[in-house]
Amino acid sequence: MLQPIGDRVIVEVKEVEEQTVGGIVLASNAKEKPTQGKVVAVGGGLYAEDGSKLPMTVQEGDEVLYDKYSGTKVKYEDKEYLVLHEKDILAIVK
């Protein structure tokens, strides 16, 4: 499995619906970019200026919302992941 470093988080991208509520099938270029996913790995965090370690807010298994233009796409073992900085995560879905 991929292990992020620093304040990076690996998110398994949640697939976007390919069909509208009305039954219209969307072309791949018409679909919205995903903005929700599941955290599958969390880095060790960053260090403050005084040397203390800053805790990560998200944990493995959290469902998160993120900005659609952030992160780097990575394909690993036939799955699509996004590598994000923790600051790019907007919210944890409870």
From Swiss-Prot:
The answer to whether keyword Chaperone applies is: yes
One GO CC term on file:
cytoplasm
List the Pfam families.
Cpn10
Mind telling me which PROSITE patterns this protein's record contains? CHAPERONINS_CPN10
Classify the source by domain of life.
Bacteria
The processes (GO biological process) annotated in the record are: chaperone cofactor-dependent protein refolding
Q: Which UniProt keywords apply?
A: Chaperone, Cytoplasm
**Is Cytoplasm set as a keyword in this record?**
yes
Q: Which GO terms describe its molecular function?
A: ATP binding; metal ion binding; protein folding chaperone; protein-folding chaperone binding; unfolded protein binding
| Ranges in coiled-coil conformation | none
Localisation per UniProt entry: Cytoplasm
What quaternary arrangement does the UniProt entry report?
Heptamer of 7 subunits arranged in a ring. Interacts with the chaperonin GroEL.
Function per UniProt? Together with the chaperonin GroEL, plays an essential role in assisting protein folding. The GroEL-GroES system forms a nano-cage that allows encapsulation of the non-native substrate proteins and provides a physical environment optimized to promote and accelerate protein folding. GroES binds to the apical surface of the GroEL ring, thereby capping the opening of the GroEL channel.
- Into which family does the record put it? Belongs to the GroES chaperonin family.
Q: Could you tell me what this protein is called?
A: Co-chaperonin GroES
Protein species of origin: Lactobacillus delbrueckii subsp. bulgaricus (strain ATCC 11842 / DSM 20081 / BCRC 10696 / JCM 1002 / NBRC 13953 / NCIMB 11778 / NCTC 12712 / WDCM 00102 / Lb 14)
Source taxonomy: Bacteria, Bacillati, Bacillota, Bacilli, Lactobacillales
Gene that encodes it: groES
